Structure formats: C-alpha cells, structure tokens
Amino acid sequence: TLAHERITATDAAPSRWLLVLHGIYGAGRNWASVMRRFVRQRPDWGAVLVDLREHGGSRGFPPPHTLRAAAADLDALAATLDEPVRAVLGHSFGGKVALVYARDFGRGLDQVWVVDSTPAAGTPRGSAWEMLAAVRRVPDRFETRAEAVAALEAEGISRPVGQWMSTNLIHGPDGYRWRLDFDVMESMLLDFFDTDLWPVVEAPPARVRIHFVKAEESAVLTEEACARIEEAGRRNGRVRLHRVAGGHWVNADNPQALEQLLVEYL
C-alpha cells in the first residue's frame, strides 16, 4: 500500500479520516504543519498524509501511471484504515486524483477539497510541465543540493521552486541524484492534462460536497473555470468555490486561510 503518515490530535481517537494528497513532485509531508494545526482544532478528524504512487516512500507501483490508478491506490489504503475515509483533499495534481477517487471509489465519502487545481482538460503547460523539461536538461548527478538549485535556476526555474524541488534529491556515494522517475511523472502529467472532470463537478456522486479553493495569485484555476464551478454550485447545491490570498503553493503562502476553511466546513 501507499506510504502514509497518520496525524491526530494528542490523545484523540478520531472517528473519521481525511486523506491528504500532494501535487506532482511533492510528498505527503508538504501538508504536515497545516494538518497538525487542523486536527488540534478538530480532534474528531484524523489526517492521513499520503505519498502518491512513485512519490516519496511509495515506490514500485506498476503502470499504467494514471489518475485512476492513483485513485485505486487510495481505495486500497482506505481499506486498511480503522475508521472510514469521509473526506479527501488534493492540491494541484492531487486535486484531480481526489475527484477521480470520489467518482470511482469513494464509498461513504462526504466531501472533496480541490486546492488550486482545475477539473478541465487542456494542453500540457504550466510550471510542473516546464519543470519536466528543465530537469531533463540538467545533469542527473550533483555534488551538492545548491549545485542542483543553481542548475535549475539557469534553466529559468525560480530559486524558491528550485529549492523545493531539491528536496527530491537523495544522497549516495556518487553525490546527489533525483529519486523521482521523470518518465513516470510525465505519464502522470499527460493523464492529468488529458482528463476532463467537469462531469464530476456538475453531477457530484450522491451525498458528496465539493469545495474548490482558488489561490488568488495563481493562474491554475481560470476565471472562466471559477464561473463554471459557481454555476455548477447554483444548479446542484453541492459545489462551492472559496478564494484565498496567496500563490499556487497556498499551503505555504496562506496556511491559516486553509485551516479556517477546513475547520469551518469539514
């Protein structure tokens, strides 16, 4: 099963789990501080920080590397938990995985949270796609992390994003190398861009409520998409859009706003 970490309030025995899904090139730990603060305020919930297939500690998963395969992995993980999964939150790439999980597997699911991700299909573009090209142009071994960050910077990647990406380097006898398989990452991203999940938003599974969180300084969720989400909510009464200040990495830029939303609506 997927590598994961369970987070609960001290001495709490939560009655339900929230699955937390990172973006491409990320790992479950990206969400640890937000979720620790959330469960302190809502000890009835526990959070499961998931490493999606071929990320973090989740290695050796067979192809195809698709959104549906990633969602099926979650279903297998949910079956091992002592309490039911009642909600799933996904950031960026993880947002689409969350929607596919709700559509195809999420028995007993009450809520889906899609954080700065779009349900729309489209041509591959944006920072994650640009990163794929950049890492293929730089060496696959480095003496230091700083050398890797500088190499990415020379390819047009901003220093903060390069520093974050360098957390995917592992140290061995011959220096630092990437622990991600970028061919697998490409397969996952191609499926992400190829998959249209508007039908899930416009006709959510029974009883499921969907919350979208748009980061105001990010272009991932266009105004056109926001209008369509709000229209879906007016029609079905189970979809809601929240706008928060911050860029795409809203869990780092504005964690307080996310925590407030989760405490209020979950």
Predicted regions and their residues:
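Active-site loop/oxyanion-hole signature of alpha/beta-hydrolase fold enzymes
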Residues: 3-11, 32-35, 39-89, 93, ...
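Short beta-strand element of the alpha/beta-hydrolase
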Residues: 15-23
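Active-site glycine-rich loops that stabilize anionic/oxyanionic intermediates
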Residues: 23-27, 92
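Alpha/beta-hydrolase active-site loop signature
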Residues: 25, 52-56, 119, 247-250
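Flexible "cap/lid" loop of the alpha/beta hydrolase fold
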Residues: 99-103, 109-142
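Conserved alpha/beta-hydrolase catalytic His-Asp/Glu region
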Residues: 125, 141-193
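Conserved serine/cysteine hydrolase catalytic core
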Residues: 173-234, 242
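Catalytic histidine-centered segment of alpha/beta-hydrolase-like enzymes
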Residues: 243-259
